[in-house]
Amino acid sequence: MSFIPPQNFGMVECDLYRSGAPTELNFPFLEKLQLRKIIYLAPDECSEMFLNWLAEQQIELIQLGDDAGHRSPWKPVSEDVVVQGLHLLLDPQNYPLLVMCNLGRHRTGTMIGCLRKLQGWNLTSILEEYRRHAGSKFRLLNEQFIELFDCDLVPTSGRWRAP
């Protein structure tokens, strides 16, 4: 048996991971993470195979995708979706947790970038992490969204509080 991570997989924090949408080849790898929940940041339906695997593994899927009929794929994820997602990320009851979108680049990168901003990371480091996962496909609108995100929309405490 081989253990192949999903595209753009990365560890964000202990028991918090990010990636693109997994395929059947990635299931053995993901099983090793013993995930409790997956946040899916896309409006698209998940494959029946993936949904069946989630049920078998007793992993809760939380879909926070914007309505595809009303948003351009080039626009950043909405502020409401980011705030909802960050509330889930800040709750240790949801861990181990995977944040994913189709390719693990833009929506996931924006969500993790806003988390890093809450943690007090400097903007250069946040954008470097975003670009590492987005590669040459990075989007300036997403970077601007992260830069201008209002951290006061998400109350934090403990390990998530910026110094």
Q: What are the functions of these language-model segments?
A:
Residues 1-99, 103, 110-163:
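Cys-dependent protein tyrosine phosphatase-like superfamily
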